[in-house]
Amino acid sequence: MSRRKARETAFKVVFQVDQVQADAKKAFDYLVLHDKLAEKNQGFSWDLIQGTLEKQAEIDQMIASYSREWALDRMSSVDRNIMRVAAYEILYLEDSQAVVAIDEAIEIAKKYGDEGSGSFVNAILDKILGEKNG
């Protein structure tokens, strides 16, 4: 559960940056205190945030290529930002287990998204993992 909280915090920060151009570090610092993110998971969460924001253009291209029915700017901002964080973890974090990252993203999507969010996020992330694995 602790890494889920770290992933959830990363999603919340990336979402805030996307929606209101929030300062990522300030948003992260606030959420660490507000959500009581354990110190041992703060580094992981911050790595997800920084990496996602740094690689966002590449990640967005990949998400867009697999979501043909939904343009990136037309899809739910919750779904979009959950997928960004999970895609970063799948593609760029060597010590990450992709299947776990996808499962966690689905659970976060069910919590914050709408009825179809979990399925949509799962479908796109499965395609991204498939491309990575060739």
Swiss-Prot record:
One of its GO terms (cellular component) is cytosol. InterPro entries: NusB-like_sf, NusB_fam, NusB_RsmB_TIM44. One of its GO terms (molecular function) is RNA binding. Keywords: RNA-binding, Transcription, Transcription antitermination, Transcription regulation. GO terms for biological process: DNA-templated transcription termination; transcription antitermination. Pfam families: NusB. The keyword Zinc does not apply. SUPFAM superfamilies: NusB-like (SSF48013). Gene3D superfamilies: NusB-like (1.10.940.10). The keyword Transcription regulation applies. PANTHER family: ANTITERMINATION NUSB DOMAIN-CONTAINING PROTEIN (PTHR11078:SF3), N UTILIZATION SUBSTANCE PROTEIN B-RELATED (PTHR11078). Involved in transcription antitermination. Required for transcription of ribosomal RNA (rRNA) genes. Binds specifically to the boxA antiterminator sequence of the ribosomal RNA (rrn) operons. Belongs to the NusB family. This is Transcription antitermination protein NusB. It comes from Syntrophomonas wolfei subsp. wolfei (strain DSM 2245B / Goettingen). The gene is nusB.
